[in-house]
UniProtKB/Swiss-Prot annotation:
Reaction catalyzed: a quinone + NADH + 5 H(+)(in) = a quinol + NAD(+) + 4 H(+)(out)
HAMAP family, sorted: NDH1_NuoI (MF_01351)
Class in the EC hierarchy, top level: translocase
Full protein name: NADH-quinone oxidoreductase subunit I
InterPro entries referenced in this protein's UniProt entry, alphabetically: 4Fe4S_Fe-S-bd, 4Fe4S_Fe_S_CS, NADH_quinone_OxRdtase_chainI
PANTHER family referenced in this protein's UniProt entry, alphabetically: NADH DEHYDROGENASE [UBIQUINONE] IRON-SULFUR PROTEIN 8, MITOCHONDRIAL, NADH DEHYDROGENASE UBIQUINONE IRON-SULFUR PROTEIN 8, MITOCHONDRIAL
Predominant location: membrane
Enzyme Commission number(s): 7.1.1.-
Pfam families membership: Fer4_7
Function: NDH-1 shuttles electrons from NADH, via FMN and iron-sulfur (Fe-S) centers, to quinones in the respiratory chain. The immediate electron acceptor for the enzyme in this species is believed to be ubiquinone. Couples the redox reaction to proton translocation (for every two electrons transferred, four hydrogen ions are translocated across the cytoplasmic membrane), and thus conserves the redox energy in a proton gradient.
4Fe-4S ferredoxin-type domain ranges (all copies): 52-82, 93-122
Keyword Membrane in record: yes
Protein's gene: nuoI
Length: 162
């Protein structure tokens, strides 16, 4: 070992320089947030938990066109259309999304001509079993009812870019 290397090892110069570097950043404001108690604002384009929307009169928006089912790359959406009603429109009898398969790409939302299926702002939907991640029509409509205000605001903010 050379004298220079021995001197550096004895004086712990690397340790001291690392200590001063740590002290320099120690007194600066924190760059992180205290997550469960503080949350960053999310983008209007954020893709979270799926929801089915309703019209203001309470009627569901989905017209059973099955475009979302056809475009889904993960084949996570299953739709069964009911018979045509007297006014010629159709509604879904069954609308299921397998959230385990879903890759949250947003193609279903883009394909929907009536903005019925959307990916809402909720990202905290952890479950204890896989079966709870199979969303049926009732669960999706409940999500839509719960998050309608935030979803409508996000769609309005994103409208100039659509």
């Amino acid at each position: 070992m050379s004298i220079n290397a021995t001197a550096r090892a004895l004086l712990l110069t690397e340790f001291v320089s690392a200590f001063f570097l740590t002290m320099r950043y120690f007194f600066q404001p924190k760059a992180t947030i205290n997550y469960p108690f503080e949350k960053n604002p999310i983008s209007p384009r954020f893709r979270g938990e799926h929801a089915l929307r309703r019209y203001p009169n309470g009627e569901e928006r989905c017209i059973a066109c099955k475009l979302c089912e056809a475009i889904c790359p993960a084949q996570a959406i299953t739709i069964e259309a009911g018979p045509r009603r007297n006014d010629g429109t159709r509604r879904t009898v069954r609308y299921d999304i397998d959230m385990v398969k879903c890759i949250y790409c947003g193609l279903c939302q883009e394909a929907c001509p009536v903005d019925a299926i959307v990916e809402g702002p909720n990202f905290e939907f952890a479950t204890e079993t896989r079966e709870e991640l199979y969303y049926d029509k009732a669960k999706l409509l409940a999500n839509g009812d719960r998050w309608e205000r935030e979803i409508a605001k996000a769609i309005e903010l994103d409208a100039p870019y659509r």
